[in-house]
């Protein structure tokens, strides 16, 4: 019985180990599949590749700059003439010859420059006309490049034109106020600005002068009363005459 129990235990242990090995193998296969899905360019490899590309681009740029500088120096050496030491030359004929040579060289270079500029302008005009034709065939419209103009430029131009011509009368736009109205406004302001004590004195003087002004008004009443009998007498005389 003990031998059978030992064999069962060994068999179970072997089965357990076999299952563990199978599970481990499955996990390894799954990990390998995930790694294979990521591809060759991992993030680390991408960083390294980017650095290498940047270094190579910088080296190429430096090489191109050196080549351009060498070509420039070579072109300048071919085009320029080595100038002689004029200070050490005393012969007038030799100096005139140097002057004539330099002048001829200058005129030649100016002619070449003019020819090159003419060719460039012609080619640019042809390119523009061809691009316009192509855009017309495609049905596209090329917007012209508009020049930005400041709003103050027009004002300055107008002011300059006005100064050059007739002078502007800025008072023409002002509101016209009559002289009488202005004097009335000034008088009202002066009256309002007077102190209170002057107003009190004026009120007292007005009260004193009020009775004196009433007294003379009684005389016309008496005169009217005297005039009424005279009118009646005249009417009576007219009746008698009739």
Curated annotation (Swiss-Prot):
* CC per GO annotation: sarcomere; troponin complex
Summed up, the tissue specificity of this protein is:
Expressed in body-wall musculature, with weak expression in late-stage embryos and strong expression during the larval and adult stages. Also expressed in vulval and anal muscles, and weakly expressed in pharyngeal muscle.
> Matching InterPro entries, A to Z?
Troponin, Troponin_I, Troponin_sf
Keywords, A to Z? Actin-binding, Muscle protein
Q: What Pfam families does the database record attribute to this sequence?
A: Troponin (PF00992)
List compositional bias (Acidic residues) regions by residue number.
220-242
Q: Tell me, what is one Gene Ontology molecular-function annotation carried by this entry?
A: actin binding
Annotated GO biological process = locomotion; muscle contraction; sarcomere organization
* Composition-biased stretches (Basic and acidic residues): 8-32, 190-208
Query: Source organism's superkingdom?
Result: Eukaryota
> What's this protein's function?
Troponin I is the inhibitory subunit of troponin, the thin filament regulatory complex which confers calcium-sensitivity to muscle actomyosin ATPase activity.
Query: Know the name of this protein?
Result: Troponin I 2
UniProt lists the gene as unc-27
